[in-house]
Amino acid sequence: AGASAGCGNPVGIADAKTGETVLDLGSGGGIDCFLAAKEVGPTGSVIGIDMTPRMLELASTNAEKLETTNVVFKLGHIEQIPQEDDSVDLVISNCVIALSEQKERVFSEIFRILKPGGRFVISDIVTDKPLPDDVRKSAAEWVSCVGGAAVMSDYLAMVEETGFDKIEILEDRKSTGGTEEWRSSMINLTLRAFKPAE
């Protein structure tokens, strides 16, 4: 499908059910959306959100090629998701929240759009200690999902403070690549949490 960079496989472990509504934050070329679309079937639906028109165009082209009819792509930002309150069963995201400077806002938006009892499965880059200032301020490191990586304990605290419960780390493996000392603190995190049922 092209133009999809990730740090995990949220769809593979999200356990999307037939008939569910799934929303993908930062859908890129749409690969995670198309995988989710197969799981939810024709009675379900998948919404891909991306902030770049070029990616939306690519994803729509890919949807046509794959003859996928239960996926829609929307232009939007993850800090202000263009979706109704309490309307989604499952939110997925693959290495996107690290790109936001407003992670608390992103988690609040996820909480807002999830139905009571709904869940998210997110793969993201975090660290086990604060990054050096020069890394956090480097545009190149932000683009590669590194510069915006939060310390894992802070990331988990944001999720909990938003109101999610049953927070579960599904995977946390050290990132590989690079020779700089700080790279050894990078972690690929996959996390699941639930919006409490009413």
Task: Give the residues covered by each predicted segment.
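Short alpha-helix
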Residues: 148-163
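Hydrophobic beta-strand segment of the Class I
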Residues: 22, 91-92
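Core SAM-dependent methyltransferase catalytic element
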Residues: 165, 172, 176-198
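A short glycine-rich, Lys/Arg-flanked "PGG" loop and its adjoining helix->strand segment in the class I
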Residues: 104-119
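Short, glycine-/aromatic-enriched active-site segment of Class I SAM-dependent methyltransferases
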Residues: 127-146
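Class I SAM-dependent methyltransferase SAM/SAH-binding core
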Residues: 18-80
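Class I SAM-dependent transferase core
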Residues: 1-23, 62, 135, 182
